[in-house]
A protein has these predicted regions:
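Short linear regulatory motifs enriched in tryptophan with gly/pro/ser
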Residues: 1-180
Length: 180
């Protein structure tokens, strides 16, 4: 028997600038110790961001959510079949729009590309690569797309699982302690 109310819509809106995206950002690679991994088998952050906000804003939210110390180059990879898939659309910093050492043309600039313009769908994963020297790899999964953005400040972290690894590990320091 019905309740007289319309059926509740799942959070699978069509997306766009007026939508709110809930994203899970999972750390999947980087310079971490075995001890850290055993103590933190899953390190992820859930972030909500408005569709009108840019990939640059998402980067800053991830940067703060994972307690990073220093800025580095980064890019987002949308589509393809995994990280570094040459068929993925790459969104990069302005300085990386022309790279004489990379023949793959970027799809866009992170400072101008909005979340809502990417055509994301619920359950769709995409990649975020931070610090091209240390290679911090993250998989971002779209958990929900809401057709309305409630009042509030976005982006915002709504959940944290696991500790943030240190951005830089003192690999030599571990050996020094053994010599004392």
């Amino acid at each position: 028997m019905g309740t007289g109310r319309p059926a509740r819509k799942k959070a699978q809106g069509i997306g766009g600038p007026g939508s709110l995206y809930t994203l899970e950002v999972q750390l999947i690679g980087g310079p971490v110790t075995e001890d850290f991994v055993s103590e933190n088998p899953l390190v992820s952050r859930t972030i909500q961001i408005a569709g009108k906000q840019t990939l640059e804003r998402l980067h800053h939210a991830i940067y703060l959510a994972f307690d990073r110390e220093e800025e580095h180059m980064y890019e987002f990879q949308i589509g393809g079949k995994g990280l570094m898939d040459p068929k993925a659309r790459r969104y990069v910093l302005s300085a990386a729009m022309v790279d004489p050492f990379d023949d793959r043309k970027p799809a866009g600039d992170v400072t101008r590309t909005t979340i809502g313009s990417l055509g994301l769908k619920v359950d769709q994963p995409f990649g975020y690569w931070f610090d091209f020297g240390d290679d911090w790899w993250h998989q971002i999964t779209v958990l929900a797309i809401h057709d309305h953005v409630p009042r509030g400040r976005y982006p915002q972290v709504t959940n944290k699982t696991g500790d943030s690894p240190p951005q830089y590990i003192d690999w030599d320091g571990e050996d020094d302690d053994a010599d004392d």
